[in-house]
């Protein structure tokens, strides 16, 4: 299948024009190659997994490897990955905030997996787009919800902070929730599920009597891989897909 056809499929659901101005979603490494037979999917592209790229034609990640621009190509991990992809004729595409803001992404994943009702975007961009999801859940304790989140995202660890005795209204902010703590306090859900919070963020949610479940950033968005795989399988024929779920937390030891 042609690379432009694959990109067209992805952008028909997650248009890159909806990315944030600071983001680098879209085609990042474009080469003369047109035919795509094997695609590599991952949330992040890690140097530890570079050997897995040897026979792929295209890499699609959630987080863009090239984010704020490049001033030099040296011997750091990102530069080595860039050189490897160019040398091996590998097309590289990222769907980051263009993916985040659509209801068919993480919004639908968490809504379906947790059987949420009365849902809406946690942080609205407009009536049709936004970040995360708020919704109601039935008959699940806070601790059990933590186990469910750990299982559906294949997370290595989960932190659970019980700050009240309710667990009906949830606010889920996949990825970093640090910029949206004030939104959460204003919304007043029973429980917030997110990642990348600092000391004062956790303290503020405790003072607001809002339960908190923290997972690592990568795990909170691991569903990206399966969502993109499902889309590609539905709209393409004969393309081999390699899924990678490596995370920066793989080397973390819980003691």
What are these regions (language model features)?
Residues 1-255:
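Active-site catalytic microenvironments in core metabolic enzymes, especially phosphate/sugar-handling
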């Amino acid at each position: 299948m042609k690379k432009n056809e694959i990109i067209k499929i992805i952008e028909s659901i997650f248009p890159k024009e909806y990315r944030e101005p600071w983001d680098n979603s879209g085609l990042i490494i474009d080469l003369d190659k047109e035919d795509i037979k094997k695609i590599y999917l991952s949330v992040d592209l890690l140097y530890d997994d570079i050997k897995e790229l040897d026979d792929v034609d295209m890499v699609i990640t959630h987080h863009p490897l090239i984010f704020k621009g490049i001033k030099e190509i040296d011997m750091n991990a990102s530069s080595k990955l860039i050189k490897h992809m160019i040398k091996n004729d590998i097309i590289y595409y990222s769907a980051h905030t263009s993916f985040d803001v659509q209801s068919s992404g993480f919004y639908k994943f968490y809504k379906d997996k947790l059987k949420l009702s009365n849902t809406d975007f946690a942080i609205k961009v407009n009536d049709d787009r936004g970040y995360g999801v708020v919704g109601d859940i039935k008959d699940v304790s806070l601790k059990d919800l933590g186990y469910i989140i750990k299982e559906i995202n294949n997370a290595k660890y989960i932190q659970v902070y019980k700050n009240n005795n309710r667990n009906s209204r949830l606010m889920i902010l996949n990825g970093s929730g640090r910029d949206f703590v004030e939104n959460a306090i204003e919304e007043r859900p029973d429980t917030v599920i997110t990642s990348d919070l600092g000391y004062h963020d956790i303290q503020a949610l405790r003072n607001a009597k809002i339960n908190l479940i923290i997972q690592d950033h990568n795990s909170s968005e691991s569903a990206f891989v399966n969502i993109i795989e499902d889309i590609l399988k539905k709209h393409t024929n004969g393309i081999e897909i390699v899924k990678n779920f490596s995370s920066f937390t793989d080397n973390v030891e819980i003691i």
